[in-house]
């Protein structure tokens, strides 16, 4: 994602978030309201490849869109979860299974940031691939922690527990009639094929008469994947820009 990590979006208007991460996630500090049904806070993935994670606040709920890691040469970079209250995240939406979009899921479980009944919502292929990739990531993490003489950031139990939250859907399962409900708020959501990986999807969220679309990672032009499905119109679009500075690119995977 090619956006400024010190800014976020409130229905298309850029807002300064330099101090946002220092604000505890209490009800008194919630920014979303009648005039701004969505507030989006980048927790990772801005001006970098990896650790994609967006914190979406609505009037009654808090959600994460993706929850990945960035694998460096000497260390793993996790999203910045500072200011998120324990058990305050009501659901996590995954655009696809690559570890830069899913690898920090055991961290939010370990830090007890997910509400008791919070689901992890994904397409069926993404759910299946995430089971494989997160267990593989755990083994790598255990080996690296042992080699460096450090404590583990998460455990096998965390992987097991967060995967136990997985709720998988077909691409069109989030159309009108299916929605995530938190308290008195109906958050409608829809997945559409993003053509990047088996099960990859863009995500549309809708509440309060407004809609925001997250592209996830797009494309690959693979003969083994269907074409990208056009998303609905949106008030705000969060768009991948990994190769946005190149006039041509033959493949994106």
Model-derived regions, located:
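Short, well-ordered alpha-helix to beta-strand connector turns
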Residues: 89, 163-166, 234, 241
């Amino acid at each position: 994602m090619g956006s400024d990590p010190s800014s976020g979006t409130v229905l298309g208007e850029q807002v300064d978030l330099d101090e946002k991460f220092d604000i505890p996630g209490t009800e008194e500090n919630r920014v979303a309201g009648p005039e701004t049904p969505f507030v989006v806070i980048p927790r990772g993935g801005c001006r970098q490849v990896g650790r994609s994670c967006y914190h979406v606040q609505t009037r009654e709920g808090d959600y994460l869109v993706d929850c990945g890691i960035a694998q460096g040469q000497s260390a793993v970079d996790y999203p910045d979860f500072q200011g998120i209250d324990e058990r305050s995240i009501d659901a996590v939406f995954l655009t696809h299974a690559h570890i830069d979009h899913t690898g920090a899921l055991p961290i939010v479980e370990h830090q007890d940031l997910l509400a008791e009944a919070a689901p992890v919502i994904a397409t069926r292929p993404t759910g299946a691939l995430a089971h494989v990739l997160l267990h593989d990531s755990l083994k790598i993490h255990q080996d690296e922690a042992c080699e460096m003489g450090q404590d583990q950031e998460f455990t096998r139990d965390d992987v097991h527990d967060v995967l136990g939250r997985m709720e998988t859907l077909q691409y069109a399962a989030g159309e009108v009639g299916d929605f995530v409900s938190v308290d008195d708020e109906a958050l409608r959501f829809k997945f559409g094929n993003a053509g990047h990986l088996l099960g990859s999807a863009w995500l549309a969220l809708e509440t309060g008469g407004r809609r925001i679309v997250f592209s996830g990672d797009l494309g690959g032009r693979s003969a083994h994947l269907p074409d990208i499905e056009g998303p609905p119109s949106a008030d705000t679009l969060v768009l991948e820009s990994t190769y946005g500075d190149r006039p041509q690119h033959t493949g994106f995977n």
